[in-house]
């Protein structure tokens, strides 16, 4: 109920009026930037055991954009969240709340989470959701070739951190990318390469910096084709089975 009232209030007031705070820390553009530095509400939330029941209520606000299923939007405006590691979710929400990751659309909603415990609760609920299988993929006429090109690039540079099936690494804060929307992946990698995602991992920036736009398209096409065994939602009744 609390989340529903907050959502109504935000939408009726106009979320554009709730601008993000000025950055409290320098991001990757600063010489003293340290990725995933300890401290603050992020570290507090990571030490807490999330309660999925309470997290379900907290997620009501998030569901307005990311959908109740956590599927986000295939056009990439809102990422697929379901099944994401709690560590990644907590870090990204804390970074947005602190002004380290610039996201004016997300900030008013992230700001409704009242304390580190609620961050942990929401993350626990989201992580437990199955990953939808009908996410946005690359659909160009050259899809097969692009996916093949992306697979080769991914296995050379991305697999070590993000895993064979896109499972990421919970302990190292590397995100699950299986089931993520192609357009979201492409946008994030482009922003990381070009220095516009201020909370980016410097190690990833070094890897991705030399890639051309065409190569990023190929990698994103392949990444969006990945599925994570045991974590994906079951196909809807009546849906055609994949061969």
Question: What are the language-model segments listed below?
Answer:
Residues 52, 63, 67-101, 107-112, ...:
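Gly/Gly-Pro-rich "capping" loops immediately C-terminal to redox-active cysteine motifs
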Residues 14, 51, 106, 118-119, ...:
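Generic hydrophobic secondary-structure packing signal
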Residues 55, 62-68, 122, 126, ...:
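The canonical Cys-X-X-Cys-His
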Residues 19-26, 73-80, 96-129, 134-140, ...:
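Axial heme c-ligation environment in periplasmic c-type cytochrome domains
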Residues 22-58, 74, 127-153, 173, ...:
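Electrostatic cytochrome c docking/interface patches
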Residues 27-28, 121, 181-184:
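Conserved long hydrophobic alpha-helices within structured protein cores
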Residues 1-45, 94, 98, 225-243:
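N-terminal export/targeting leaders of redox proteins
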